[in-house]
Amino acid sequence: MKLTRRESKERRHRRVRGKVQGSPERPRLAVFRSNEHIYAQVIDDTQHHTLAAASTVEPELKSSLASGSNCEASAQIGKLIAARSLEKGITKVVFDRGGNLYHGRIKALAEAAREAGLDF
């Protein structure tokens, strides 16, 4: 039987999470993409702590963005999560695309975070 898009995404997500592990030296940059918004977190999996977070739901960003579901908004979140991580002394991360394909909004966020100084 053919897999649905949701089942395919869940399988990719499980496969990615099996290979990607965040540590205190190199935490995980996890990205969640919904139809309307995008969310990014820097997570230390050994302590189960979120070290930094950014999303298009935040009031200061929401007012300046035309839409939370385009590549421009994703790039803004990438820059913001990189700035917040660098403030806390985090320069290296492991990228967790969360089962999403590395394309479009996910790619825009990743490239903006790299340009802003995160290493992955």
UniProtKB/Swiss-Prot annotation:
One of its GO terms (cellular component) is cytosolic large ribosomal subunit. GO terms for molecular function: 5S rRNA binding; structural constituent of ribosome. Keywords: Ribonucleoprotein, Ribosomal protein, RNA-binding, rRNA-binding. InterPro entries: Ribosomal_uL18_bac-type, Ribosomal_uL18_bac/euk. CDD domains: Ribosomal_L18_L5e. The keyword Ribosomal protein applies. Gene3D superfamilies: 3.30.420.100. Residues 1-10 have a biased composition (Basic and acidic residues). Disulfide bonds: none annotated. Residues 1-26 are annotated as: Disordered. It holds the Pfam family Ribosomal_L18p. GO terms for biological process: translation. NCBIfam families: L18_bact. This is one of the proteins that bind and probably mediate the attachment of the 5S RNA into the large ribosomal subunit, where it forms part of the central protuberance. Belongs to the universal ribosomal protein uL18 family. Part of the 50S ribosomal subunit; part of the 5S rRNA/L5/L18/L25 subcomplex. Contacts the 5S and 23S rRNAs. This is Large ribosomal subunit protein uL18. It comes from Nostoc sp. (strain PCC 7120 / SAG 25.82 / UTEX 2576). The gene is rplR.
